[in-house]
């Protein structure tokens, strides 16, 4: 899980979602998981 000020899709499988008011990126590749913070 990467914590970043700006989250972006890294590949075409990445999905930007909102969970509990946080913007997150989920992907089949665990290295692409990101959270805004």
From Swiss-Prot:
- Spell out the molecular function terms from Gene Ontology: structural constituent of ribosome
Coiled-coil features, chain-numbered ranges: none
Q: Which GO terms describe its cellular component?
A: cytoplasm; ribonucleoprotein complex; ribosome
Sorted UniProt keywords: Ribonucleoprotein, Ribosomal protein
Superkingdom field: Bacteria
Q: Name one GO biological process term.
A: translation
PANTHER family linked: 50S RIBOSOMAL PROTEIN L36, CHLOROPLASTIC, LARGE RIBOSOMAL SUBUNIT PROTEIN BL36C
What NCBIfam families has UniProt attached to this entry?
Answer: rpmJ_bact (TIGR01022)
Question: Any idea what this protein is called?
Answer: Large ribosomal subunit protein bL36
Gene this protein is translated from: rpmJ
